[in-house]
């Protein structure tokens, strides 16, 4: 029988939680022992239950393993600390540069809007004037492009309307021409019938 997948979440029932803790703890220590024996590794496992009770397993003396771990952690921290501090310092310098750049851009933007010009020198005002002229040229160029595009679309629409008008006029003329031919045929037939009626019978002899 296939067992369903157990959802990993806190077990609310206290009795079930204690039973599961006991089973999982035993399984954990068993796996730790197997790892130690099979791979000739130093293994230590420390578990505190919810009630605060200590449970532990070690392949050798727990104190020696913990002491070894402490020395390794301290050595790793000491070796990595200068690199971390240098990275943080570089990051701080980069942030300072970005803040200064943003401040300069904000000041320049205000000057382009005509604000804070009292402290500007003649050279700065000339640079601002040049920048404004450049911006105006860009705006005018873009405006001309939009107008040209709009004019092109209007001309295309005008051409479509003229073609449609021409087509409708041709249809109207064809309709009138066809109607006129039909009425002319009717009139010719009627005249023939009238003339036939007039000449039927013997000619009258005059005295």
Curated annotation (Swiss-Prot):
Keyword Ribosomal protein: no
Transmembrane segments: none
Keyword list, A-Z: Developmental protein, Differentiation, DNA-binding, Flowering, Nucleus, Transcription, Transcription regulation
Location(s) in or outside the cell: Nucleus
Database matches in SUPFAM superfamilies: SRF-like (SSF55455)
Domain MADS-box per the UniProt entry, residue ranges: 1-61
Record note on disruption phenotype: No visible phenotype under normal growth conditions.
GO biological processes: cell differentiation; flower development; positive regulation of transcription by RNA polymerase II; regulation of flower development
Domain K-box: 88-178
Any one Gene Ontology cellular component term annotated for this protein: nucleus
Gene Ontology terms, MF aspect: DNA-binding transcription factor activity; protein dimerization activity; RNA polymerase II transcription regulatory region sequence-specific DNA binding
InterPro entries with a match to the protein in the record: MADS-box/MEF2_TF, MEF2-like_N, TF_Kbox, TF_MADSbox, TF_MADSbox_sf
Function per UniProt: MADS-box transcription factor that acts with AGL42 and AGL72 in the control of flowering time. Promotes flowering at the shoot apical and axillary meristems. Seems to act through a gibberellin-dependent pathway. Interacts genetically with SOC1 and its expression is directly regulated by SOC1.
Protein name in UniProt: MADS-box protein AGL71
Organism of origin: Arabidopsis thaliana (Mouse-ear cress)
Gene: AGL71
